[in-house]
Amino acid sequence: DKTVFELQARDWRKSGDQAEISGKQIAEWMRQLKLSGAGNYGYYPDDFFFDLCDELGLMVWQDFMFACAHYPEDAVFTASVRAEVEDQVLRLRNHACLALWCGNNESQAMHRINADISGDDTPLSGLALYDDLIPGLLRMLDPETPYWPGSPWGGPNPNSMRSGDVHDWTVWHGVPPIPDAYMTEAFASSPKGVAYTRYAEDTARFVSEFGIQGAPALETLRRWMDPADLHPESSGFLARIKDEARKADAMMATVTGLPETIQDYVD
């Protein structure tokens, strides 16, 4: 047994053109990254991925397929979840790389944030899955692998920095820090409020998620967009941004200044 004092990991997301990427390419990329772990959410990777992580000594955090929402607890849906969990656990439980099963991504945390803001603490539908059904199946099928009911989780607030894991979205999203049980301020949207320098305020024991929106490669934009829309102020460009279209302006304003060309935006 060895205690892990530092973990450097990356999210592993299914590529839209996965069929065009060879196993050899994937293996080479993972070797180049020199990581100690990978987190999977949004899908269950195939056996090749887990075999490769076994070979490279990477630890895998595997989410079940729930995120950021209420989920039914009726008999039909529960039976479907049971079948899915049994199928995936039996397939993956013998991999040495499997370090942790996680019940969901952000369901408890987002529910708590919304309740603190609105004052409406409607019970979270889906807790029966994360607190009873899934851990019950794991106790029977894979009692050796740790289970985490959700991410983030721990402490007096699911996203508390006091214990457990934390999703740090003060930077970019403006989510107020939660050093203990409650958010310390209102949501931020100003350049100062969402600045990357606020990472210094994070005292979390384990930060399992953070990030800033990044632009795709210029070649990708040119491939898919009308040439007339290749400008950071065009409606066609802004409409393709998944998050609030002007959110990046606050990040760039005090660091690089606002972009004048699409190349500026990408850079």
Language model segments and positions:
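Active-site neighborhood of glycoside hydrolase catalytic domains
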Residues: 55, 70-164
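Flexible loop/turn segments at secondary-structure boundaries
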Residues: 11-13, 45-48, 67-70, 107-111, ...
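Active-site-adjacent substrate/metal-binding segments within catalytic domains
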Residues: 1-69, 77-100, 238-267
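Substrate-binding clefts and catalytic carboxylate motifs of secreted carbohydrate-active enzymes
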Residues: 101, 136-139, 148-151, 155-164, ...
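Generic enzyme active-site microenvironment
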Residues: 61, 104, 207
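Short, charged/polar micro-motifs that form catalytic or ligand-binding hotspots
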Residues: 43, 124, 193, 197
